Amino acid sequence: MAKDIGLNVKAPKTECNDPQCPFHGSLAVRGQIFEGTVVSAKMSKSVVVSREYLKRDLKYDRYEKRRSKLHAHNPPCINAKEGDKVVIAECRPLSKTKTFVVVEVAGHESN
């Protein structure tokens, strides 16, 4: 049974024994929550998530599109694939570059 992580996301249906899973392990999530698209799932239990956001240009009073890539832990019970829209939440540093964990697959991006 998956524990409540304090976010409004659906718990995964499958079980896993990953200690770094927020639902079945002991990893606490806190901080920022982002939505993005998985652009690479080649690493073991990790994904690269690309997110687009708007940045305001004060001089011209307009917005510009920006993009950033974030590395996130991909628990086996969630198992996000390339092209999936995912919700990631901040957690403690899991490695040198990973400070986020995938908490929900919100669909698949269609081109």
Swiss-Prot record:
MF annotations from Gene Ontology: rRNA binding; structural constituent of ribosome
Q: What's any one GO cellular component for it?
A: cytosolic small ribosomal subunit
InterPro entries the UniProt entry points to: NA-bd_OB-fold, Ribosomal_uS17, Ribosomal_uS17_arc/euk, Ribosomal_uS17_archaeal, Ribosomal_uS17_CS
Q: Keywords in UniProt for this one? A: Ribonucleoprotein, Ribosomal protein, RNA-binding, rRNA-binding
Annotated Pfam families: Ribosomal_S17
Could you mention a single GO BP entry for this protein?
translation
In terms of PANTHER family, this protein maps to:
40S RIBOSOMAL PROTEIN S11 FAMILY MEMBER, 40S RIBOSOMAL PROTEIN S11-RELATED
Q: Which family does it belong to?
A: Belongs to the universal ribosomal protein uS17 family.
Task: Describe its assembly.
Answer: Part of the 30S ribosomal subunit.
Q: What is this protein called?
A: Small ribosomal subunit protein uS17
Source organism: Methanocella arvoryzae (strain DSM 22066 / NBRC 105507 / MRE50)
